[in-house]
């Protein structure tokens, strides 16, 4: 009953509004004429329809139908052609083509009429061309900056070595040698650290290496440096015995000593003034990092305390801030053997493996979702691909890039990336499941549209 009353009231209001419209239109014809009255009538009906939509309840289906109708009207509305620029108005207008209904006549050619110039087609670059442009703009470092960075790193190494010899005269350190990607042609942008090796000179015959899997840590990445010959050379015979923990040379104790020295004892303002730059030790990182600011570049120097060549395999072990039971162990540094292997493979067939590695490093640094993929992960991927006997010329760089993305996605699906030189080490073991999902999704999206990564 209420609905009926509502419809009846609505009908009465419609009739009243309709009579008012008729009255207005009738009088408008006298004043405005027929054309003006028509315009006024259309405007009045539009207002009436707007009022009806706002006041009357409507069914959901009717609303959706009207919405789709309005959308179709918008799509069907012809777009206005833009007005030609003033310069084009002075150009001669080309004659119109004869219509099909016009009688055919002899074809006349006007040699003075110039053909209309079409706009240039949009530039579509291939993946190969985009990779080369990305390499030129985001990867390549100017030679002047490389030379300046090497000079600063070498000067800092000399100053730091002089300080260590005066501060710890009883500890035999070897020559401080700067190195790393900057020196091996593997620097992708300015994000990589300069590696400053601080080697310990251990007495031959008093130390031996124990694999990490044979220790309580059960970590295949690490090694323990054990003190031997205690019956002939008792504890205290070696200056490094002060860093022993349970009969093993502790990397953690040595790192704590050197971190305190770098943060509190070194006169960095004086050294920086001498070298023409600003040097500050990084207090936020557990690693021994020096932040260098020059007017022409910024540089980070990683001070790496190392134990070189204790065994016949000439392994390089680093004092690294490890957690848990592995805190006193030494991390095996694979960078030297990785860089040497990539160089040997490229020299054999004039390949582009190292260029592919630089591209991958720059892409991952430029994408926040891929930030967890470090140089170590990407180097292993390139090494696995690099051992295959495929085309490694510059023309195949785009194909190898996509192949590297596919290999990364496959490894993430299995949550396993074995080390090329030690398959028992899974380089994805430190990633959480959420991080693996995020990286996998970003790589899958990049595989569908590789240009989006560049």
Curated annotation (Swiss-Prot):
Its main location: mitochondrion. Residues 44-454 are cytoplasmic. The chain crosses the membrane at residues 23-43. Residues 1-22 are mitochondrial intermembrane. It is linked to Combined oxidative phosphorylation deficiency 49: An autosomal recessive, mitochondrial myopathy characterized by progressive muscle weakness, intermittent muscle pain, exercise intolerance, elevated serum creatine kinase, and deficiencies of multiple respiratory chain enzymes. Does not bind ADP or other nucleotides, in contrast to MIEF1. Mitochondrial outer membrane protein involved in the regulation of mitochondrial organization. It is required for mitochondrial fission and promotes the recruitment and association of the fission mediator dynamin-related protein 1 (DNM1L) to the mitochondrial surface independently of the mitochondrial fission FIS1 and MFF proteins. Regulates DNM1L GTPase activity. This is Mitochondrial dynamics protein MID49. It comes from Homo sapiens (Human).
């Amino acid at each position: 009953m209420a609905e009926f009353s509502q419809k009846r009231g609505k009908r009465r209001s419609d009739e009243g509004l309709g009579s008012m419209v008729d009255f207005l239109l009738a009088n408008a014809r006298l004043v405005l004429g027929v054309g003006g009255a028509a315009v006024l009538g259309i405007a009045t009906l539009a207002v009436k329809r707007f009022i009806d939509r706002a006041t009357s309840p409507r069914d959901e289906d009717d609303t959706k139908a009207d919405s789709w109708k309005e959308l179709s009207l918008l799509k069907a509305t012809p777009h206005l052609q833009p007005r030609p620029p003033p310069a084009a108005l002075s150009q001669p207008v080309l004659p119109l083509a004869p219509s099909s209904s016009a009688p055919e006549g002899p074809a006349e050619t006007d040699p003075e009429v110039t053909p209309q110039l079409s706009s240039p087609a949009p530039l579509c670059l291939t993946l190969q061309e985009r990779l080369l442009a990305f390499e030129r703009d985001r990867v390549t470092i100017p030679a002047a900056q490389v030379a300046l960075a090497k000079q600063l790193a070498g000067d800092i190494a000399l100053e730091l070595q002089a300080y260590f010899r005066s501060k710890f005269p009883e500890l035999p350190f070897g020559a401080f040698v700067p190195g790393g990607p900057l020196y091996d042609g593997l620097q992708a942008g300015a994000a990589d650290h300069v590696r400053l090796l601080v080697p310990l000179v251990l007495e031959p015959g008093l130390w031996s290496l124990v694999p990490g899997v044979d220790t309580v840590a059960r970590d295949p990445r690490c090694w323990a440096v054990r003190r031997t010959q205690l019956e002939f050379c008792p504890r205290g015979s070696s200056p490094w015995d002060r860093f022993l923990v349970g009969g093993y040379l502790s990397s953690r104790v040595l790192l704590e000593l050197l971190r305190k020295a770098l943060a509190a004892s070194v006169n960095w303002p004086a050294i920086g003034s001498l070298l023409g730059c600003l040097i500050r030790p990084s207090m936020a990182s557990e690693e021994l990092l020096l932040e260098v600011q020059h007017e022409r570049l910024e540089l980070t120097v990683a001070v790496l305390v190392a134990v070189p060549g204790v065994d016949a395999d000439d392994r390089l072990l680093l004092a690294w801030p490890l957690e848990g039971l592995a805190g006193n162990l030494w991390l095996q540094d694979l960078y030297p053997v990785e860089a040497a292997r990539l160089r040997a493979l490229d020299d054999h067939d004039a390949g582009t493996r190292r260029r592919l590695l630089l591209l991958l490093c720059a892409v991952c640094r430029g994408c926040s979702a891929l930030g967890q993929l470090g140089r170590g992960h990407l180097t292993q991927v390139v090494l696995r691909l690099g051992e295959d006997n495929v085309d490694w010329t510059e023309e195949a760089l785009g194909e190898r890039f996509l192949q590297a993305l596919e290999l990364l996605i496959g490894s993430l699906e299995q949550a396993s990336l074995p080390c090329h030189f030690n398959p028992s080490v899974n380089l994805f073991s430190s990633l959480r499941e959420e991080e693996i999902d995020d990286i996998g999704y970003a790589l899958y999206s990049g595989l569908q549209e590789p240009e989006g990564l560049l």
